Amino acid sequence: MTSVNLYKQDGSQNGTVELNDAVFGVEPNENVVFDAILRQRASLRQGTHAVKNRSAVSGGGKKPWRQKGTGRARQGSIRSPQFRGGGIVFGPTPRSYKYSLPRKVRQLAIKSALSQKVLDNSFVVVDALNFDAPKTKEFADVMGNLNVAEKTLVVVTDDDKNAALSARNLANATVVTPAGVNILNVVDNQKIVITKSALSQVEEVLA
């Protein structure tokens, strides 16, 4: 099993912790990660774009001129697509961009991304993040103690409310619970800081 250093809040090492190879020892699959990111980004699209076709544009109910005898091309409505102010042909309509991937493929993508973080030494496990009260400065000090200055995904349990409140105002930190870990926020952040209890929950879900 892969092992990584276990740290305290003050940055000192507190032994090591074993990582489940079924989650953190997977050979990274870039194609699966790419597909999973595309799927999640597609699901974030609003899809509310719309234009008016010739049936939705106001006016145009009267034939602009008679069918024959004017020398001009025959027309049935001034809201036909060829007219200024006419309806749009084949324009976008409201739709959902969501599509599905098999559950095992989605899990493999997250496992691949997490395994890559471990290989890059960008996976930091903390014994606990205990705060008496929500203090952004105190959490920033903890990040400094851990030598983490990059854009970071902080994973804490539901019980670590003060830690979550302390970190949420930091520009370079994104705070989630184990249930909120997804392929997009794992890949989008350079480092992951996770508590030991949150690590157990992540392994329980993905293993």
Swiss-Prot record:
GO biological process terms held by the UniProt record: translation
Function recorded in the entry: One of the primary rRNA binding proteins, this protein initially binds near the 5'-end of the 23S rRNA. It is important during the early stages of 50S assembly. It makes multiple contacts with different domains of the 23S rRNA in the assembled 50S subunit and ribosome.
UniProt keyword RNA-binding, yes or no: yes
UniProt GO cellular component terms: ribonucleoprotein complex; ribosome
Region (Disordered): 48-87
Subunit structure: Part of the 50S ribosomal subunit.
GO molecular function: rRNA binding; structural constituent of ribosome
Family to which this protein belongs: Belongs to the universal ribosomal protein uL4 family.
Provenance organism: Limosilactobacillus reuteri (strain DSM 20016) (Lactobacillus reuteri)
Classification via Gene3D superfamilies: 3.40.1370.10
NCBIfam families the UniProt entry points to: rplD_bact
Keywords (A to Z) from UniProt: Ribonucleoprotein, Ribosomal protein, RNA-binding, rRNA-binding
Keyword Methyltransferase: no
HAMAP family documented for this protein: Ribosomal_uL4_B
Designated name of the protein: Large ribosomal subunit protein uL4
PANTHER family: 50S RIBOSOMAL PROTEIN L4, LARGE RIBOSOMAL SUBUNIT PROTEIN UL4M
Matching Pfam families: Ribosomal_L4
